[in-house]
Amino acid sequence: MCGIVGAVAQRDIAEILIEGLRRLEYRGYDSAGLAVVDNEKNMFRLREVGKVQVLADEVDKQPVLGGTGIAHTRWATHGEPNEKNAHPHVSDYIAVVHNGIIENYEELRVQLIALGYQFISDTDTEVIAHLVHWEQKQGGTLLEAIQRVIPRLRGAYGAVIMDSRDPGTIIAARSGSPLVIGLGVGENFLASDQLALLPVTRRFIFLEEGDIAEVTRRTVRIFNTQGKPVEREQIESNIQYDAGDKGIYRHYMQKEIYEQPMAIKSTLERRLSHGQVDLSELGPNAAKLLAKVEHIQIVACGTSYNAGMVSRYWFEALAGIPCDVEIASEFRYRKSARRSGSLLITLSQSGETADTLAALRLSKELGYLTSLTVCNVAGSSLVRESDFALMTKAGAEIGVASTKAFTTQLTVLLMLVAYLGRLKGVDAEQEQEIVHALHALPSRIEGMLSKDKIIEVLAEDFSDKHHALFLGRGDQYPIAVEGALKLKEISYIHAEAYAAGELKHGPLALIDADMPVIIVAPNNELLEKLKSNIEEVRARGGLLYVFADQDAGFTDSEGMKIIPLPHVEELIAPIFYTVPLQLLSYHVALIKGTDVDQPRNLAKSVTVE
């Protein structure tokens, strides 16, 4: 949600700021702006509603010169998406960009109005600008003023601030919303996501919770919550990402669907050996500690939560470990029993999801045995704060609707199931079966992608529909949930998912000739039960679309279309059956003409509550 870019350099940095914002477009936004200070201490500010390109066009019309600047893409929380609410916000010579929410902004606003400040916008961000301005007038440096302001702010935020009277310095403050410093040669940068800075540097410092950083062209000074100078680790990034390169694909989502075989291969690389899963990357003490796990608690949001629901079936059936899955925003506010023998697993593509981070921190207070994160971004907050981390190696995922991050999360979770099962004394033959299935997975998905044209034609049936129902059983039920989420995210069709056995308990009332029902039907022990559910829908005139194993015994009939899929190993069937539902959602969205990569009202990384 939202994006921040900042730069301090000897060269003009407007183009760097604009390019950084372009690389953050995938996070979702409704307006964009920048402020640049030149060597004569003149500040130039420009804000536009709409795409970053609108801002770029305005910059082209009136060249913006200067080597110190900040820029922002805004996703509205306080105040409508219009120019006056777009960032940066200013108070005389102070300019601020900010991600997150200041929970006590109304109280601060009243205090500032009493001091004579006038508010132009409806945002919570403007209080930061005025507070810093007020503290500056009381004396001290910009850094000292900000250090006095921060304790007065309640909420989760990341803010970058500059003073036009002091070109060559920008200050960053992190409290719950990610910020990263990019290290250059005679120039330094700031952003909310390292992707924004890849054209100018590969060296990064990730700010930790409560950090305040003073960044100049040649120096970076970081202070912790006690105001003491601290050193933070420098990380060399190997992420490959070209924001403008969709290659032969129309959208990032389409590209990322097709990248899944390679993403899974990368995720499996060096982790499968001689019929075993090799997770030695967890360190020498991991096996001894994880062998003590008596219960697993998974917390996640959105698509990652659906991955957690699939893995619950695996952890219990294959590793024999009791497992619960909970939405992170519910877990963090529920009064939980203490869990001394419990492993907390967090799932997040970005590693910065606010509710998931809060759940991790809560688990430490509750006495959990240990924590492990499955994440796609090295150096992210979840990776740094968890005891153990297993990285998905999906590469940058730009489309808001997650595809390859989901399937690589499931891939890692299945490896973890095999590893924990071995620690618990599960038969070695089962681990060998998991390893065999995982080896086969990339080629199985490549075969699935060859069905794309069939699904493209099928999608035409959905162009005039307003609702859809997804059904599955067992570990395919969460896949039905994920399919419904994808369809509603990018095509704006209202879609719900149920365990097929729940039809009689309510959803059957929705079935009529205008309600498409999408069913995932692998050839497993639940197939006959699922066929009974299918007949219940047929008897009531429902429109059935069944993604079925080619050996499951289905044939097309009136009111029922069968999409036959190649047989796949049962262990990896949930991952495999995800792909046709991704393709269906993508093609329906194309037909409806929605913004596939940046669907309305949604953001890629939700870093606030």
From Swiss-Prot:
UniProtKB keywords: Aminotransferase, Cytoplasm, Glutamine amidotransferase, Repeat, Transferase
Descriptive protein name: Glutamine--fructose-6-phosphate aminotransferase [isomerizing]
Known role: Catalyzes the first step in hexosamine metabolism, converting fructose-6P into glucosamine-6P using glutamine as a nitrogen source.
EC id: 2.6.1.16
InterPro entries noted in UniProt: GATase_2_dom, GFAT, GFAT_N, GlmS/AgaS_SIS, GlmS/FrlB_SIS, Ntn_hydrolases_N, SIS_dom, SIS_dom_sf
Catalytic activity: D-fructose 6-phosphate + L-glutamine = D-glucosamine 6-phosphate + L-glutamate
HAMAP family registered for this protein in UniProt: GlmS
Species: Photorhabdus laumondii subsp. laumondii (strain DSM 15139 / CIP 105565 / TT01)
Assembly behavior: Homodimer.
Entry-linked CDD domains: GFAT (cd00714), SIS_GlmS_GlmD_1 (cd05008), SIS_GlmS_GlmD_2 (cd05009)
The keyword ATP-binding belongs to this UniProt entry's keyword annotation: no
